[in-house]
């Protein structure tokens, strides 16, 4: 799951807003509804796993939460002769599931049910070329983020074994 597939801009204009503001930290789509409810003065629904981004919008020093991403295979059949990607890459995307955490500090951990797990420092390696997952220097980071992904899976009743 690469940045190009997950980076989606969200534009919002608030009543009384006189200046533009850009938040470059990753945020999650599941936070949009709680943010809109917060702006309307309504309570967040108990079934919404997301949190309001209003503190982040109003305060430039507020740190965003970790962002969790899920990829579940699309088991549809890809037409033979497709040139979207090499056959091996298409087969991998169709058959594997991934759970990803992107931290506010710029780290990204991808855990998979099949294939290789990955860790990237997006600040130093924005194109995700150097997988640091097996680097002993980053083992505590991998452990901490793995625990957070498992906690997220528990919260969202995600039964995928990683």
Q: Where are these predicted regions, by residue range?
A:
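Substrate-binding rim/cap in mid-to-C-terminal beta-strand-loop elements of soluble/periplasmic
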Residues: 1-47, 51-63, 70, 102
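C-terminal, low-complexity/hydrophilic appendages and adjacent surface loops
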Residues: 3, 69-134, 162
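Generic structural signal for small/hydrophobic residues in well-ordered secondary structure
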Residues: 9, 32, 53, 109-112, ...
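Internal amphipathic alpha-helical segments of the cytochrome P450 catalytic fold
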Residues: 29, 33, 116-119, 129, ...
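Non-transmembrane alpha-helical segments in soluble domains
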Residues: 33-37, 41, 54, 120, ...
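Short, solvent-exposed polar/charged micro-motifs at secondary-structure junctions
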Residues: 55-59, 76-81, 154
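Long, internal low-complexity/basic segments
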Residues: 132-162
């Amino acid at each position: 799951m690469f940045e190009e597939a997950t980076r989606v801009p969200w534009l919002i204009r608030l009543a009384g807003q006189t200046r533009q503001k850009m938040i470059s930290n990753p945020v999650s789509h599941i936070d949009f509804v709680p943010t809109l409810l917060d702006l309307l003065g309504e309570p967040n629904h108990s079934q919404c796993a997301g949190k309001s981004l209003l503190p982040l919008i109003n305060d430039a020093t507020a740190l965003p939460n970790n962002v969790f991403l899920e990829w579940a295979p699309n088991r549809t059949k890809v037409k033979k002769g497709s040139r979207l990607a090499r056959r091996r890459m298409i087969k991998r995307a169709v058959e594997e599931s991934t759970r990803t955490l992107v931290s506010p500090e710029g780290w990204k951990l991808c855990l998979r049910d099949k294939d290789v797990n990955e860790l990237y420092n997006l600040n130093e390696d924005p194109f995700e070329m150097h997988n640091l997952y097996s680097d002993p220097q980053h083992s505590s980071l991998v452990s901490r983020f793995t625990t957070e992904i498992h906690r997220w899976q528990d919260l969202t009743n995600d039964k995928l074994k990683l």
